[in-house]
Design a protein with these regions (language model features):
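Inter-lobe coupling/hinge segments of SF2-like helicase ATPases
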Residues: 1-170
């Protein structure tokens, strides 16, 4: 608990879609989702920056505004870049640099729905480590992924809360 996540999308429309869906999913669980774009100005922007710096905002969704100098994260642990091919090396490094004041570097997840040939991807993203894990560590139980219809959301939330109350991972 107390860690933060930043999700950066290349357009305000895509970022807003992510924001709206994440608010719908996470705010009922008590997770504060922040919306940060270049169009947010003045007192509203300062209030949002304060929530990010204090750690009150656990998930920050935005566009390039997420990597501006005045955005300071309290405990950034995960940076997600959607449509990663739309951002250059400099933007990815700026997002990672948000943790220079801490002893650890955030995990970086890059997503894209655009098929990029493997050779081009390996050339374009040569600054990144790529690993493939194709077996479980000894003694590890396989993860079971389940998909539920949206009309069962309350049931899923209740089950997650029960598991967390028992001290289990979810």
């Amino acid at each position: 608990a107390g860690w933060q996540c930043a999700l950066m999308a290349p357009t305000e429309i895509l970022a807003e879609q992510h924001f709206r869906k994440l608010v719908q999913w996470l705010e009922p669980l008590g997770v504060r989702v922040a919306w940060l774009t270049g169009s947010r100005k003045g007192k509203a922007r300062q209030a949002m920056l304060a929530q990010i710096a204090s750690g009150e905002a656990a998930l920050v969704v935005g566009i390039h505004a997420v990597i501006q100098d005045d955005v300071v994260f309290a405990r950034l642990a995960l940076a997600i870049v959607d449509e990663q091919h739309r951002f250059g090396v400099a933007q990815r490094l700026a997002l990672r640099a948000k943790l220079e004041h801490q002893a650890l570097e955030p995990h970086l997840l890059m997503m894209s729905a655009t098929p990029i040939p493997r050779t081009l991807a390996m050339t374009y993203f040569a600054d990144l480590d790529v690993s493939t894990i194709d077996e479980l560590p000894p003694g590890r139980t396989p993860v079971v992924t389940k998909v539920f219809a949206d009309n069962r959301r309350d049931e899923v939330i209740a089950r997650i809360r029960d598991e967390v109350a028992r001290g289990r991972q979810v």
